[in-house]
């Protein structure tokens, strides 16, 4: 089974995270940031991933360190769980509607970290979650997992719905990208490596 568990401890956060790419039944998320817990749970459920997250952070300051560090550990776990990347689709994309909002995510498990994030988040805060942390989370995942990630909010008026559409699209796009494909021998690259 493709899986990884990691712990990251700094003076600002303590993150314990486990990711299972092939087993999506066990999802448990506790970061101390309610809206972020909800988004990570949606990502895992819609991607059919197992995900267990326990995070303690300096949320008395704000949620920035917690959200970013969870993204770093998730990216590291993804990179480790993918092993040599043989036989996977490599690419994945998904459009996800959430009522009036439409989100899109495209992923290339390329070995090159890059992110494009487009979207207007008009409400600056949802509960204790600063909405600008949405981009910070995706940036941290893309950087540490060495993937190319494009995330775009095409339209919408409700900030909660916009972010929810992105996290669901992220799960669905990543599921497609990591899926094993019987028609692919080795890695899906003319270079012979990713």
UniProtKB/Swiss-Prot annotation:
What Enzyme Commission number(s) does the record list for this chain? 4.2.1.19
Catalyzed reactions per annotation: D-erythro-1-(imidazol-4-yl)glycerol 3-phosphate = 3-(imidazol-4-yl)-2-oxopropyl phosphate + H2O
Q: Which NCBIfam families match?
A: PRK00951.1-2, PRK00951.2-1, PRK00951.2-4
The source's superkingdom equals Bacteria
Quick one: where is this thing mainly located?
Answer: cytoplasm
Spell out the family assignment given in the record's similarity comment.
Answer: Belongs to the imidazoleglycerol-phosphate dehydratase family.
Cytoplasm: is it a keyword of this entry? yes
Q: Where is the signal peptide?
A: none
Q: Could you tell me the keywords of this UniProt record? A: Amino-acid biosynthesis, Cytoplasm, Histidine biosynthesis, Lyase
| Location relative to the cell | Cytoplasm
State the Gene Ontology terms under molecular function: imidazoleglycerol-phosphate dehydratase activity
Pathway stated in the Swiss-Prot or TrEMBL entry: Amino-acid biosynthesis; L-histidine biosynthesis; L-histidine from 5-phospho-alpha-D-ribose 1-diphosphate: step 6/9
Q: Which residues form a coiled coil?
A: none
Q: Name one GO cellular component term.
A: cytoplasm
**Entry's Gene Ontology BP terms:** L-histidine biosynthetic process
Q: List the disulfide bonds.
A: none
Q: What is this protein called?
A: Imidazoleglycerol-phosphate dehydratase
């Amino acid at each position: 089974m493709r899986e990884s568990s990691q712990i990251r401890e700094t003076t600002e956060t303590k993150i314990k995270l486990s990711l299972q790419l092939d087993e999506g039944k066990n999802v448990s998320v506790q970061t101390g940031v309610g809206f972020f817990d909800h988004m990570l749970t949606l990502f895992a459920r819609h991607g059919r991933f197992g995900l267990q997250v326990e995070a303690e952070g300096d949320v008395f300051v704000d949620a920035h360190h917690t959200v970013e560090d969870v993204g770093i550990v998730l990216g590291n776990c993804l990179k480790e769980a993918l092993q040599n990347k043989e036989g996977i689709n490599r690419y994945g994309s998904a459009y996800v509607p959430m009522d009036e909002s439409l989100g899109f995510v495209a992923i290339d498990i390329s070995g090159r970290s890059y992110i494009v994030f487009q979207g207007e988040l008009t409400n600056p805060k949802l509960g204790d979650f600063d909405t600008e942390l949405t981009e910070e989370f995706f940036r941290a995942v893309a950087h540490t997992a060495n993937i190319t990630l494009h995330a775009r909010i095409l339209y919408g008026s409700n900030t909660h719905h916009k972010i929810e559409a992105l996290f669901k699209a992220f799960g669905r796009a990543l599921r497609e990208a990591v899926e094993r494909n019987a028609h692919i021998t080795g890695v899906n690259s003319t270079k012979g490596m990713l």
